[in-house]
Regions:
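Buried hydrophobic packing segments
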Residues: 114, 138, 175-179
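Short, glycine/acidic-enriched loop or turn micro-motifs at the edges of active sites
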Residues: 20-22, 137, 174
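Short phosphate-engaging motifs
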Residues: 109-110, 145, 174
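Conserved non-catalytic scaffold segment of RNase H-like nuclease domains
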Residues: 1-129, 150-166
């Protein structure tokens, strides 16, 4: 069955992506959160929910010009369509509840931003005890540099199906396709659960996630990270 190794230990998979005002986890803010919820029903993997919301900013917060250029999300978009952080945090808690595996492409980045948003406006304990899988770490073991999501889309022949637009909803839909292509290529995704690759020279960007094991990951590894 599709994604058998992941569903053998989890009841639900939640793939997610964020767009943010910058790169500083504790200072910048999430402006868009998107997720795809997968569950196994009648021995088939089904999409149970596709979620996408723009998020209001704290007083004085704004979308920098370079972020608007990258994502197409403007300050006006946030004012007119953004929903409160507290509401998004409640939705995240609902999606993440139970025996759920959390997946993202560059998961350390997205989880770090989620941590601080949940800490301020929700229930950060929802992240505690959750298995986490970083598909960027998997891709770095599969292909040579560069390792952006757009590179994975091209490598797996998905350019006519999905797009890396730097909008969270597009990127998370692309991540779902990339994950399935990765599993079809080699069924070892479960071995990357709670294992994130880190920069071999600079280490982890920001604070480590307590439940995750970090190992230095080189651009052209001779063997999978889980065998080191």
């Amino acid at each position: 069955m599709e994604l058998e190794s992941l569903f053998s230990r989890s009841d639900r998979l939640v793939l997610f992506d964020t767009e943010t005002t910058g790169l500083a986890y504790s200072k910048d803010e999430i402006i868009e959160f998107a997720a795809v919820v997968l569950e196994r029903r009648d021995d088939k993997v089904q999409v149970m929910e596709t979620y996408d919301e723009l998020i209001t900013l704290s007083p004085g917060g704004f979308v920098p010009a370079m972020i608007e250029k990258l994502t197409g999300i403007s300050n006006q978009d946030i004012r007119e369509r953004g929903v409160p952080k507290t509401r998004v945090c409640c939705d995240i808690a609902r999606m993440f509840a139970g025996n759920t595996l959390l997946l993202a492409y560059n998961a350390h980045f997205d989880l770090s931003f989620l941590f601080y948003m949940l800490l301020r406006d929700g229930d950060v304990t929802i992240l505690k005890g959750k298995d986490k899988l970083d598909l960027l770490t998997v891709y770095k073991d599969r292909r040579s540099y560069p390792h952006k999501l757009c590179n994975a889309i091209e490598a797996y022949g998905l350019s006519d199906k999905v797009v890396n637009s730097h909008r969270a909803v597009d990127d998370v839909l692309a991540t779902v396709k990339v994950m399935k292509a990765m599993e079809a290529e080699k069924d070892d995704l479960a071995r990357y659960i709670q294992l994130f690759g880190s920069h071999p020279t600079y280490g982890v960007d920001g604070k480590q996630i307590g439940s995750v094991t970090y190992k230095p990951q080189y651009y052209d590894p001779m063997q999978p990270l889980y065998e080191l």
